[in-house]
Regions:
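Short beta-strand edge/turn micro-motifs at domain boundaries
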Residues: 102-122
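Short, cysteine-centered beta-strand-loop-beta hairpins and adjacent loop/turn segments enriched
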Residues: 64, 90-100
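Short beta-strand segments enriched in hydrophobic/aromatic residues
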Residues: 28, 88-90, 105, 120-121
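Hydrophobic/aromatic beta-strand elements that line small-molecule binding cavities or substrate pockets
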Residues: 69-76, 88-89, 102-108
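Residue-level signal for tight coil/turn positions that link beta-strands
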Residues: 79-81, 111
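A solvent-exposed, acidic/Ser-Thr-rich amphipathic alpha-helical stretch
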Residues: 6, 21, 25-79
Length: 122
């Protein structure tokens, strides 16, 4: 079974290569919980639980935006968690407008899978 460090490094490498949804699908546990600081556009709740709801949240987000550029610091691993600092440019698919977006993401790993992802941004 992969360690938290193994998961963190592979997951982060996938993100760096633009494989955002594939990284989630590879590592999300069936009972994953995803936590945002606020509700998302499209009626997506700030907290969703389960792999189906988390995939739907991800598909909704990537349906409205694309990541044009990303710089990731980390992973910073402690115990069963790892954190990433992500600095990116996201582009609205409808308007074509881009903006800088920074976030901290904290992931909890159990049995080689991500059981919680928690995002911090304003």
């Amino acid at each position: 079974m992969p360690t938290t460090e193994n998961v963190a490094r592979d997951f982060t490498d996938m993100l760096r290569h633009g494989q955002f949804q594939a990284a989630g699908e590879k590592y999300w546990a069936d009972d994953v919980t995803s936590v945002e600081p606020m509700n998302l556009p499209g009626g997506i709740a700030a907290v969703v639980s389960g792999i189906i709801a988390t995939k739907a949240k991800s598909e909704s987000w990537f349906g409205g935006c694309r990541i044009e550029d990303i710089c990731i610091d980390g992973p910073f691993v402690t115990g069963d968690q790892f954190a990433l600092f992500m600095d990116m440019v996201i582009v609205n698919r409808v308007s074509g407008e881009g903006r800088s977006f920074d976030e901290i993401a904290l992931y909890t790993v159990r049995n080689g899978q991500i059981t919680e992802e928690r995002y911090f941004y304003d």
